[in-house]
Amino acid sequence: TRRLRHDLSDCVVAPRYRTDEGPPRCLPWEDIRRILRAVPRDRPVGLRDYAMLLVMATYGLGSGEVVHLELGDVDWRARILRVRRRKTGVPLELPLLPAIAQALAAYLRRGRPSQTLGHTIFVSLALPHRPLTTSAIRHRIREHAHRAGISAAKLGAHVFRHSHATRQIDAGAPFKIVGDILGHLRPASTSVYVRVALRRLRMAALPVPR
């Protein structure tokens, strides 16, 4: 056999072996409520953040979906909130619940800058009023969690989505419906929340008397 003059081992791409994903970071629902209560709603930034986080917590939307919500996605007459799924592209119509409608209306009337040129709902309050980014949402979540006395160091922008999904499964919601609402294409994507729910059940289980 012939030998190479140069070592080409660095050019060989090692195969990647897929491992099971770890459980998503979730918070108890009472902690989610504490974060929402901690948002000060006497200023425009608080009106925006409260409406944004309430939408995420109530519907389990991801930050990538929330930052793309537009004014036309809110059908006030039909009481529908339309969401464009980022992963699947499938449109989703959600009921515009009274609490959501009230929070959005308060923000749009007294919080969102009137001179904003675009149609994006959640925008920066500083000029030039660009749409919020997912990293900005993560920052806002951590700030309000810290205000609520909740450790925020590892909280990501999807913690509300993960907590919503786990809460639905804890409440006995059908597995398929939870996956559809979250926009999952594969059942395995939803199964991670089942593992979280089972882990919580084990932690809450009473010891068997001997």
Predicted regions and their residues:
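Conserved catalytic core of the tyrosine transesterase superfamily
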Residues: 1-210
